[in-house]
């Protein structure tokens, strides 16, 4: 449901507070070739270092949901060509993703990525393989292309949940873990609020699981702001 502009703002805010390279989802590129070009321009401007773009038809769905539809492979190649042409930083990494596993089959997924590789992308990504055997087959057939392969570590999704070492041993070069931070936050806040209401507006029962206030303030950089206020304030 997030728009291109909303994603740009999220990426920009994250990149402002870290020097760690940011891998930012670009969904479908938010439209046709012109929107795909605008997407990479915005992602670079925001400070991201990597994006992946997928071959789903709009409106897209989570890769581990049912009901997905694909655009023709040639249409995706056109988007990729346009995006690469608009890239200003040669070190910005563009990963081509296919969602064919949830729509057609493994052979189509591999054929699509082979054709996307020919356009000049920097990495390849099959989303939602169903088994370790399929992951091994993806690696075996795509490794000869010489491009890094991405593995999506999603707990309770369509794919088997592997450790990074297990994925690496299968031939994958790097991984994303996009869902677990949200799941952890949801569980922590849910349990805190349930305890708060059950214990009469108190969190004493879970105090050992709460970050101390001073530690949190240090984490968000409050000391720096206080020092700057003292330096420049009246």
Regions found by a protein language model. Name each.
Residues 1-153, 157-173, 177, 183, ...:
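Alpha/beta enzyme core
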Residues 182, 186-234:
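Extended, intrinsically disordered, low-complexity segments
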């Amino acid at each position: 449901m997030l728009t291109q502009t909303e994603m740009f703002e999220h990426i920009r805010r994250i990149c402002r507070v870290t020097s760690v390279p940011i891998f930012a989802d670009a969904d479908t590129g938010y439209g046709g070739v012109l929107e795909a070009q605008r997407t990479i321009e915005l992602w670079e401007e925001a400070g991201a270092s990597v994006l992946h773009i997928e071959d789903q038809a709009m409106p897209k769905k989570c890769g581990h949901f049912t009901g997905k539809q694909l655009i023709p492979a040639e249409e995706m190649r056109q988007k990729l060509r346009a995006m690469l042409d608009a890239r200003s930083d040669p070190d910005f990494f563009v990963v081509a993703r296919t969602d064919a596993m949830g729509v057609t089959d493994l052979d189509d997924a591999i054929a699509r990525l082979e054709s996307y590789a020919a356009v000049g992308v920097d990495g390849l990504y099959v989303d939602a393989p169903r088994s370790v055997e399929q992951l091994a087959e993806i690696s075996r057939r795509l490794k000869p292309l010489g491009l890094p392969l991405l593995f999506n570590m999603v707990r309770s999704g369509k794919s088997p949940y592997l450790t990074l070492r297990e994925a690496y041993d299968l031939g994958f070069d790097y991984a994303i873990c996009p869902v677990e931070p949200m799941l952890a936050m949801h569980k922590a806040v849910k349990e805190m609020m349930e305890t708060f209401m059950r214990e009469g507006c108190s969190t004493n029962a879970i105090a050992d699981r709460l970050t101390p206030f001073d530690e949190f303030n240090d984490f968000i950089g409050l000391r720096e702001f206080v020092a700057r206020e003292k330096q420049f304030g009246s």
